[in-house]
């Protein structure tokens, strides 16, 4: 129950987004903040930097995040990330969003686009039976992988960072 404006509301799991419970950085480094900063869109960012290399085209940030579904059988599932790229022109750094399919034991690419240079929320909604993205053996775990890469630069190579403001799984039971 939550009190808001003198009224009491009963919240269901359909109203509460699944928040980050774990994070693993496969490539890159955390320069500021942490996973605790990702629970809401509040302009408090976790800053992720690619590990410096001699070849700027090999710069990458690769992160896996995990949460827990409110139900093992949600009717609908989505993944929302709010982020921005700092340090260069729009369009040079790509953001790929994958959700882990527990039936095939592999990640499914759901979105791939240039990351914005201002805070921008991207929501992906898988189609079909969304329970494939929920661990069915008791944990109700959700796993997403977000990869930021540079394929080529439109201008000169540059140093860049990613600021992530929010990562959640809004769901409907």
Regions found by a protein language model. Name each.
Residues 104-134:
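Extracellular carbohydrate recognition and processing domains
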Residues 54-56, 70-74, 90, 117-119, ...:
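Surface-exposed coil/turn segments at beta-strand junctions on protein surfaces, enriched
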Residues 1-44:
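Activation corresponds to long, low-complexity, non-globular regions
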Residues 131-149:
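Noncatalytic modules at the cell exterior or secretory-pathway interfaces
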Residues 4, 150-173:
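Exposed low-complexity, polar/acidic, P/S/T/G-rich flexible segments that act as propeptides
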Residues 59-63, 67-88, 146:
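A short beta-strand element within beta-rich, extracytoplasmic domains
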Residues 46-71, 125:
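Short beta-strands within extracellular/lumenal beta-sheet-rich domains
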Residues 91-103:
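Short, surface-exposed beta-strand/strand-loop-strand elements in extracellular ectodomains
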